[in-house]
């Protein structure tokens, strides 16, 4: 998940001069990310649940893994409530001025500001599964 904020978004910011094109590039990155990241998160959650069920059936401690699973999935409400407004603003700008009457294309400064905000929020979102892994590893040691 950190590849996007550490490499992809800085590359977009370095190469984009047209605000609509820059927003469209972000929208393409989002398109591929949304097809990859949620299945990975769901798979991770299923693995946590499977391990929790195994441990419970063997009367072993499982609470820490449950905390790790919940923390990992915390990125979903974070995305819906914190990141969605920025996503929606970038999607509107990616549509360009021709998409809706009376709409003007965003300035390069506006798109850049939204991308920088999205980048910071995505880093924060990426910390949920990372924290979940750290919690799970602390249980394994």
Swiss-Prot record:
**Source organism superkingdom:** Eukaryota
Give the GO molecular function terms.
monooxygenase activity
- Which of UniProt's keywords are assigned here? Membrane, Monooxygenase, Oxidoreductase, Signal, Transmembrane, Transmembrane helix
- Bilayer topology annotation: Multi-pass membrane protein
EC number annotated for this UniProt entry? 1.-.-.-
The broad enzyme category this protein falls into is oxidoreductase
Task: Tell whether Oxidoreductase is among the UniProt keywords.
Answer: yes
Signal sequence range:
1-19
Single GO cellular component term: membrane
The cross-references to InterPro entries, in alphabetical order and at most eight, read:
Anthrone_oxy
Which residue ranges traverse the bilayer? Answer: 33-53, 64-84
- Subcellular localization(s) per the UniProt record: Membrane
The annotated pathway is: Secondary metabolite biosynthesis
Q: What induces it?
A: The cluster is expressed in rice fermentation medium. Three regulators are located in the cluster (ptaR1, ptaR2 and ptaR3), suggesting that the production of pestheic acid is controlled by a complex regulatory mechanism.
Main location class? membrane
Report the sequence similarity comment from the record: Belongs to the anthrone oxygenase family.
Q: What does this protein do?
A: Anthrone oxygenase; part of the gene cluster that mediates the biosynthesis of pestheic acid, a diphenyl ether which is a biosynthetic precursor of the unique chloropupukeananes. The biosynthesis initiates from condensation of acetate and malonate units catalyzed by the non-reducing PKS ptaA. As the ptaA protein is TE/CLC domain-deficient, hydrolysis and Claisen cyclization of the polyketide could be catalyzed by ptaB containing a beta-lactamase domain.
Protein name per its UniProtKB record: Anthrone oxygenase ptaC
The major lineage groups are: Eukaryota, Fungi, Dikarya, Ascomycota, Pezizomycotina
